Curated annotation (Swiss-Prot):
NCBIfam families associated with the record: YlcG_phage_expr
Taxonomy of the source species: Bacteria, Pseudomonadati, Pseudomonadota, Gammaproteobacteria, Enterobacterales
Name of the featured protein: Uncharacterized protein YlcG
InterPro entries referenced in this protein's UniProt entry, alphabetically: YlcG-like
Family membership: To equivalent protein in phage 82.
Inducing stimuli: Expressed during stationary phase (at protein level).
Further facts: Encoded by the cryptic lambdoid prophage DLP12.
Protein source organism: Escherichia coli (strain K12)
Length: 46
């Protein structure tokens, strides 16, 4: 349970940073962020 909470917090923080500083914007931006994050998780074997 704690691991899931930490991952959610990490993702929320990272997402907020990307949205604010790099890609202010749209649904396509959200999709790109999630897609890249999913790739990193699959590459890590999670």
């Amino acid at each position: 349970m704690m691991f899931e909470f930490n991952m959610a917090e990490l993702l929320r923080h990272r997402w907020g940073r990307l949205r604010l500083y790099r890609f202010p914007g749209s649904v396509l931006t959200d999709y790109r962020i999630l897609k890249n994050y999913a790739k990193t998780l699959t590459g890590a074997g999670v």
